[in-house]
A protein has these predicted regions:
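Structural detector of well-ordered beta-strand residues that form the stable sheet scaffold
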Residues: 40, 63, 129-131, 155, ...
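Glycine-rich cofactor phosphate-binding loops and adjacent beta1-alpha1 units
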Residues: 31, 73, 78-153
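C-terminal hydrophobic helical "lid"/dimerization subdomain
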Residues: 118-122, 161, 165-213
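Conserved acidic E/D residue at the C-terminus of a beta-strand in Rossmann-like folds
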Residues: 66-67, 134, 158
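Glycine-rich phosphate/adenylate-binding loop and adjacent beta-alpha elements
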Residues: 1-3
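Mid-domain Rossmann-like dinucleotide-binding core that forms the NAD(H)/NADP(H) cofactor-binding site
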Residues: 10-88
Length: 213
């Protein structure tokens, strides 16, 4: 078991954000992200956004990809330098231009969409590292010849491995500002309505926290 003390300056209603932040951090750690590298992140939900902000903290350059324009605009407002709408932009060409032809040394797949999982191979550089943290509902066929040709490393990432202390520190020092990611805080009796609202308007929310009173 892991026991981590919540810093005094992290409000109780924001502390649960540490758990999804550990998922984002673990995905980056699994891919062994380094300063100066380009990190393409597919999925601009809470985990994808925090992966982008954490990559920036590690002095890498994040490129965040999604099909929800509102999430991309919000990420850009928070300082993510490159955002791409997969529904509109020519993502491969755009990343080629951003990276001066090398493509991304690290790719984080945080959407779970089968098509996005397949596309990670095209976004990665030669000898690139791909970290899969999204949960697909079905199997995805991948061209193994491309994996071999580009010498890609594919790594699953589904949990955290000692990242809670780092996550809490980042929340405490506002390297990741919890207010930027928690869209709404509700009481326990408000959860059913919050779930309906989230299901109806997913573009409006990143993370909803429920608290005891």
């Amino acid at each position: 078991t892991f026991n981590s003390k919540i810093p005094d300056n992290v409000p109780s209603e924001m502390a649960p954000l540490a758990e999804p932040l550990t998922i984002a951090l673990h995905a980056l750690h699994r891919a062994n992200v380094k300063a100066g590298e380009y990190v393409a992140i597919i999925g601009a939900g809470a985990i994808g956004l925090m992966a982008a902000l954490s990559a920036r903290h590690y002095k890498a350059t994040p490129i965040l990809i999604d099909i929800v324009e509102e999430r991309l605009r919000y990420a850009q407002k928070l300082g993510v330098p490159y955002v791409l709408n997969a529904a509109d932009d020519q993502v491969i060409d755009a990343i080629k231009n951003i990276t001066h032809g090398t493509m991304a040394q690290v790719v984080i797949e945080a959407s779970g969409a089968n098509s996005a999982i397949r596309n990670t191979l095209d976004l990665a550089s030669f000898a690139g590292r791909i970290s899969f943290t999204g949960w697909p509902k079905q199997e995805t066929s991948l061209p193994t010849n491309l994996i071999t040709y580009k010498e890609l490393d594919l790594r699953g990432s589904r949990t955290s491995a000692g990242e809670f202390d780092e996550a809490l520190r980042m929340l405490s020092t506002l390297e990741i500002n919890p207010q930027d990611v928690v869209s709404k805080v509700v009481n326990l009796d408000e959860i059913p309505d919050a779930v309906k609202e989230l299901d109806r308007y997913p573009e409006r929310y990143l993370k909803i926290n429920a608290v005891f009173h």
